[in-house]
Regions:
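Single conserved hydrophobic/aromatic residue that forms the stacking wall/gate
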Residues: 251-265
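Non-heme di-metal
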Residues: 2-252
Length: 265
């Protein structure tokens, strides 16, 4: 998130996490994959891999909503009032934002629209989603889908975090390990290709700019407050959050390396 380095100054433990991740994030944002995104085919292949990270991000935030609010019947109050409010507001934007035509859509669906417009293949991700619907099981569905092992490792890590039921860890990975990792360079590459008439990428540019806009103005401050609320003064929780963030950022880098390898075949 663009404003995170300013906001972390308000809490020493948040500073610790941010400092811990600076080097890893710089390496990720300057990854060589962005140097080879020069053609329509490059961007298509990138999106065909990256869409799985977009999908499992939605499961990450929904896990927080499930744990921090009451989504069961009959309803009962939840003790996490502040964190619950914050996560509900974040879910509203992530799950029910608007597209270029003003229609309500999740950010995942916005990304699929972008893939369709740019000509990226959506067969594998759609097949995976259908298996999720049929099986009602992530583990069974991912094992039945022919995915690269690194993409599977990336998603398996996310679900390991979710299954830990440690809300402070889930919130921290959501905040530091996922929201802040769309490099400006990628957006500029897409804009450049779009201006050269090589691709029609209105939906993708909208998705990327919308993601950054919502994050900078709303999700960044909300997510930081949520981490403070969930970790409190517990040093063990802060340590667990930092370790998970470090691994999440490294796996983000590995996920991009796979896309880079595809380009070099």
């Amino acid at each position: 998130m663009n404003n995170i380095k300013t906001l972390v100054k308000t809490k020493p433990t948040l500073i610790d996490i941010d400092v811990e991740l600076i080097y890893l994030k710089e390496n990720l944002n300057s990854h060589k994959i962005y140097q080879v995104l020069k053609s329509v085919n490059d961007v298509q292949l990138f999106m065909e891999n990256h869409v799985f990270a977009v999908w499992d991000f939605m499961s990450l935030i929904k896990a927080l909503q499930k744990n921090l609010t009451c989504v069961e019947l009959p309803w009962v109050p939840n003790k996490n009032n502040l964190a619950g409010r914050l996560v509900n507001e974040i879910v509203l934007a992530e799950e029910s934002d608007i597209d270029l035509n003003g229609n309500p859509k999740s950010h995942f669906e916005l990304y699929l629209d972008s893939m369709n417009q740019i000509g990226a293949k959506t067969g594998l991700i759609n097949s995976f989603i259908n298996k999720i619907r049929e099986n009602n099981s992530y583990e069974k569905s991912v094992n039945e889908t022919d995915l690269n092992s690194t993409v599977k490792d990336f998603m398996n890590f996310t679900f390991d975090i979710i299954n830990s039921n440690k809300n402070h860890v889930i919130a921290s990975v959501f905040t530091f390990g996922r929201e802040d990792l769309i490099p400006d360079m990628f957006i500029e590459i897409v804009k450049k290709l779009s201006k050269s008439d090589k691709i029609k990428a209105d939906n993708l540019i909208y998705y990327l700019e919308r993601h950054i806009e919502v994050d900078a103005d709303e999700h960044g401050p909300m997510a930081l407050k949520m981490i403070e609320e969930l970790c409190g003064n517990d040093k063990v929780k802060w340590k667990e959050a930092t370790i998970a963030d470090r691994k999440s950022t490294r796996l983000n880098s590995s996920h991009q390396i796979i896309s880079y390898a595809v380009f070099c075949l």
